[in-house]
């Protein structure tokens, strides 16, 4: 939470506008509905939403976009009720891939690299058991792996915790191909998955792993700034269409 607040505080917006950092659950007074209420109380009529999630395959993005009225129905059943909302919503994209994200990942694992020609970076993501969402996870993480490889100059592959593919992929690169495996967790913050689940899946294998998540990283502010500019352009394009 603090890391996201710090990244947002560094934004230098071209236009003055109020900003709310909201969370899906557990943070009292800072839930999504709280943020909407505070913005609309200021007279806001258009809200730019930046979903701070690693992948388009997250079911949370699906349910949040539905609850914000961006889509008529969720792709997966949800308990999340539609929010009280009068403003028009412009919904951005999660991290997924792209050079900023690749550089964040590379910066986190760069200290573990000793001999790039003999190494492979293995991106490890959460994944999904749900059809449709798994395909989005695969599409995003495979694209990110290619970009990380371009940025780092090190062979980069990927695996998901769900369905389990981490152990076999790491074993393949280490035992069959003779590469040193550097594991990069695709998680925004430290927690159960980075400290417990990933090491458990890799038990018995040789690998390098710091457990460092993607955040904090200064490039998150750059990524958010780009999202805001793109959403503002969409908003202005829509306004011109409405006025014609």
Each PLM stretch: what is its role?
Residues 1-244:
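Extended amphipathic ligand-handling, pore-lining, and cofactor/metal-binding catalytic surfaces
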